[in-house]
Each structure stands twice: as C-alpha cells, then as structure tokens.
UniProtKB/Swiss-Prot annotation:
It comes from Xenopus tropicalis. Inhibited by 1-(1-acetylpiperidin-4-yl)-3-(4-(trifl uoromethoxy)phenyl)urea (TPAU), 1-cyclohexyl-3-dodecylurea (CDU), 12-(3-adamantan-1-yl-ureido)-dodecanoic acid (AUDA), 1-((3S, 5S, 7S)-adamantan-1-yl)-3-(5-(2-(2-ethoxyethoxy) ethoxy)pentyl)urea (AEPU) and to a lesser extent by 8-(3-((3S, 5S, 7S)-adamantan-1-yl)ureido) octanoic acid (AUOA). This is Epoxide hydrolase 3. The keyword Repeat does not apply. It is a single-pass membrane protein. One of its GO terms (biological process) is lipid metabolic process. It catalyses: an epoxide + H2O = an ethanediol; 9,10-epoxyoctadecanoate + H2O = 9,10-dihydroxyoctadecanoate; 9,10-epoxy-(12Z)-octadecenoate + H2O = 9,10-dihydroxy-(12Z)-octadecenoate; 8,9-epoxy-(5Z,11Z,14Z)-eicosatrienoate + H2O = 8,9-dihydroxy-(5Z,11Z,14Z)-eicosatrienoate. GO terms for molecular function: epoxide hydrolase activity. The lineage of its organism: Eukaryota, Metazoa, Chordata, Craniata, Vertebrata. It comes from the Eukaryota. One of its GO terms (cellular component) is membrane. Belongs to the AB hydrolase superfamily. Epoxide hydrolase family. Keywords: Endoplasmic reticulum, Hydrolase, Lipid metabolism, Membrane, Microsome, Transmembrane, Transmembrane helix. It is found in: Microsome membrane. The chain crosses the membrane at residues 21-41. The gene is ephx3.
Length: 367
C-alpha cells in the first residue's frame, strides 16, 4: 500500500507543479485525499482501542510548571506596531550582547530551546519566541494571516522590536524553513544562519520529486490541507498524535538522558489542547502551497546545517543537496543516533558545534 500511494502521490505532485490556477489546487486536494487514505489504518487503530475514549479530549486547565518557569530565562511579551500581534518570548543574557533568535517548529513552542537558552546566554542575548499562532503568542483566526510574507515580516519586526538590526538566526523544522527564507530575503539582518532538520525550500522541492519515500514521509503536509480532519486526528485519544512523535521509539527523542518527562510532554500538549488552538499552527501548512513553485534562492551568509541521522520525517540523504544553495561558508553535520528533535535530543553535541561555528572568522563578500 505504501509503495502504491507513494507512486500516486508522486504522479499527482509532479503534475500539480506543471500547472497553475484552479487545476493546481484540484491536484493538491487530490493528493490530500490520498494522504488521508494512508492514515485510515492509524485512525482505526486508535478507535478500536476504545471508540468512546478516543474522542475524549479537552483543554488542560493549567500549564505545566516547566512551561511557565523562569529557570531558562525571563518571560516577556512584545507587540508589533503595524500588525498589532503580541508575541510571547523567553529571553536570557545581557541585552548588550548580540541577538540570537531561536525559532521553533511544529507542534512546539519556546520550550524546545531550553538547552540553548542556558548554553548561549553568556555571550548572546538569546531569545526563544513563540511563533505567531503558537504557544503564548497571538493566534489570528484567518487562514491568510499565516502566509509566508506575513511570517517573514514578523521576524523583521521582532528583530527591530527587540532593539537590534541583525541577529544569529536559528531555526528548527518550520522555524528552519522560515530561517532559510528570511536569510535569502533579508540577508543584511542575519549574521549567521543555523538550521536544524529543515531543508532549504528549493532543495526539498528537487529532492522530493525524485524520492517517493520522502514524499510518503511528508504526506502529512497534504493531509493538513484538508479542513477539520487534521484537527480531529491530532486530538484523538487525548492528543496522542502530538505526544507520539516526540516520545515513541521510531519518531521521538533517541537519547535516553534527554527523554521528555511527563511534565515536559505536557509542555507541548498544553497549548494545542486549548479550544481552536490547533488550527493556527496547521494554517502554516495550509499556506505552504501558495509558496510554490519554489525558485532557486541562494543564501549569502555563513550557514550551519545540523541534521538528526534518524529523523523519521525528513531523510538525512537530502543534506548534501543544500550546499548548492549557499554561496557563503557552509558547514553541514549529520548527528548520529539523533531524531528530528535534534536540539532537545543531543543538546551537548549541538551546542558545541554551534559554538565552534560561531567562533570561526568568516570573510564574506556581500554582493
């Protein structure tokens, strides 16, 4: 079944990228329905374990202590002048130090960066934000409020609002996608780019069209285009599909010493459990195809790419494809025995590589 669906998805995706307009979106939704079919066995598994209990979920009444603690930095809010959006962040380090801006992925929040907030606050003003629609930040209800251009404008406004003109930009997963794109569009605002388990958009576009296995692994992107169904699937059996990717043996954190405690798992369930809170993060994906077709976009700032070898969502084999899109000093490291959740899985190794990278002297000639 996997092989059959992979081939069908590949045919539909390749065709969609050759057309425009209404037909393009028809094909996207055909792919979404194919993806939904692939998740039917998983949904049935959850239902057969107890049909009534599968549909029992509700908002957590209180955030876990680790999510509100100041152990990793001070919590703050900043409101953007133009958009009016209020962002929640956790910051550590002297405000006179250079800014290191940390961008999380899906379905996460600032807490993903706790190890980096601790590590780099002695030399940087480290700021881990909750992206628009996530965590404690505002979550506009309209689909169009999550278009790429708006998300990039958020980053511009955040950097300036925090009192800086440039930053070390660090992103993981969706935060990595934003970081790649921001570094292309606003290179003068980025001194160093550090990306974890997120492909350059152009490289991913090329890779996925020639690797059906990756297309199948990424089929959730198509599933998330559908209304309501993803929200229901992610909520089933008390948000099992949020917990499981973080914790199980195949998808979750591999390092025994860094396995999430029950309280830490709740740090990633608390916000999605609130009424209507899953839709804004899913709207990132629902706007993704408006970003296609992807054109070749070169990064012109020193770039570090880190990848967990055992990423169950994004194949490590695509890492060599990234270098062609970076016309600046580039370093790529695949971390053995590490999952998609790299900065939480192997924090000591990740932090050392980042620190060594930031110590290097780069002479970059800007065009």
């Amino acid at each position: 079944m996997q092989l059959y669906l992979s081939r069908l998805l590949l045919i539909v995706t390749r065709t969609a990228l050759r057309v425009t307009g209404v037909f393009f979106w028809v094909l996207v939704y055909v792919a979404a329905l194919l993806a939904a079919v692939s998740y039917i066995p998983d949904a049935l598994r959850l239902l057969t374990r107890g049909p009534l209990s599968a549909f029992r979920w509700g908002p957590r009444k209180a955030a876990p202590a680790c999510l509100t603690s100041s152990a990793h930095g001070q919590h703050g809010y900043i409101r953007m002048k133009d958009s009016g959006i209020r962002f929640h962040y956790v910051a550590s380090g002297d405000k006179r130090n250079p800014l290191m801006l940390l961008l999380h992925g899906f379905p996460e929040n600032w807490y993903s960066w706790r190890y980096q907030l601790d590590e780099f606050s002695n030399g940087y003003r480290t700021v881990a934000i909750d992206l628009r629609g996530f965590g404690g930040s505002d979550a506009p209800s309209r689909l169009e409020d999550y278009k790429m251009e708006i998300l990039l404008q958020d980053l511009q406004d955040l950097i300036r609002g925090l009192g800086y003109s440039r930053c070390v930009l660090v992103g993981h997963d969706w935060g990595g996608t934003l970081a790649w794109t921001f570094a292309v569009r606003h290179r003068d605002m980025v001194t160093h780019l550090i990306v974890m388990n997120a492909p350059h958009p152009s490289a991913f576009h090329d890779y996925v069209l020639s690797h059906p296995s990756q297309l199948f692994s990424s089929r959730y992107v198509f599933l998330f285009q559908l209304p309501l169904i993803p929200e229901i699937l992610l909520s089933l059996r008390d948000f099992e599909h949020i917990k499981k990717p973080l914790t199980d043996a195949t998808h979750g954190i591999q390092n025994v010493e860094c396995k999430l405690s029950k309280e830490e798992v709740e740090a990633f369930v608390y916000y999605p459990s609130q009424k209507g809170a899953l839709t804004p993060p899913l709207n990132y994906y629902r706007n993704l195809f408006g970003f296609f077709p992807v054109k070749a976009q070169d990064v012109l700032v020193p770039t570090l790419l880190l990848w967990g070898e055992h990423d169950a969502f994004l194949e490590a084999a695509m890492v060599p494809e990234m270098q062609q899109y970076v016309r600046a000093p580039f370093r790529a490291e695949i971390i053995p025995n590490a999952s998609h959740w790299l900065q939480q899985d192997r924090p000591q190794e990740v932090n050392k590589i980042i620190r060594d990278f930031l110590k290097e002297d780069f002479l970059v000639h800007r065009n």
